[in-house]
Amino acid sequence: MITTLITHVLNPLAYIVPVLLAVAFLTLLERKVLGYMQLRKGPNIVGPYGLLQPIADGLKLFIKEPVRPSTSSPFLFLATPMLALTLALTLWAPMPIPYPVTDLNLGVLFVLALSSLAVYSILGSGWASNSKYALIGALRAVAQTISYEVSLGLILLSVIIFTGGFTLQTFNIAQESIWLVVPAWPLAALWYISTLAETNRAPFDFTEGESELVSGFNVEYAGGPFALFFLAEYANILLMNTLSAILFLGATHIPALPELTAMNLMTKAALLSVVFLWVRASYPRFRYDQLMHLVWKSFLPMTLALVLWHLALPIALAGLPPQI
């Protein structure tokens, strides 16, 4: 009974609550970083240094009346934000920080499969809103996400060839002598840009395209459902950066001090997230055709070539003794 309680209630809560807290403070960090980059303060009224701003924001959104457009489809309209957040939080389960909540043998495949399911929540919300702006935003988001998933999958394949397994824990072991970002820096660069596009962040924020589509697929959402989408988006950003840190900046795992590994990984993920915000502050939005050209004409040939290269190298050098 107690074991069931721990595995089914306490363990999931112990990873969901910190993720949601991290998401809340990432929104504050974003506003602060953008503020200082635009030579202003950012939120600094609610609590010391504005630290309670995300809590006030969340409270404000959840106590608002959930307004639903009269022409929208009632069930799908409310189901999609819940689906988005559920998927975003489930994706954290196989993350080795340093021990995962669910020890999956094919962790990499699980992450890839679930992140592609997130497309349905965006498409469903755009369609259920019954608004042309929301639908255009949703269609753009789906096209963008599906396109960049191709390059993400191929990059993951190359990294798996390096590591020799689909289990996420093996990445930490494989990088004990050197971070994969050093021998595979082109992969790391392609991966980072693809994660920017995958999470719909600037300069690839076509889903939200404020100057064109009001707010994109979530234009008709207000209050609680909007907050769920918002949480899902930022949880995905943190997840992608944690995954980038695991894949390319692996933390050495000391069994006696697992907390050190967790702090190591989270520091790297936080720094990568700050670079996400820096990119947002620095770059204007791409044109849509340029975005598609980038992935199909540049990233796809490069990632395919790198997969073949990394496959060919060990076979070509198989006859050499290991000490060379």
Swiss-Prot record:
GO terms for cellular component: mitochondrial inner membrane. It catalyses: a ubiquinone + NADH + 5 H(+)(in) = a ubiquinol + NAD(+) + 4 H(+)(out). It is found in: Mitochondrion inner membrane. The keyword Cell inner membrane does not apply. It is a multi-pass membrane protein. GO terms for biological process: aerobic respiration. Core subunit of the mitochondrial membrane respiratory chain NADH dehydrogenase (Complex I) that is believed to belong to the minimal assembly required for catalysis. Complex I functions in the transfer of electrons from NADH to the respiratory chain. The immediate electron acceptor for the enzyme is believed to be ubiquinone. This is NADH-ubiquinone oxidoreductase chain 1.
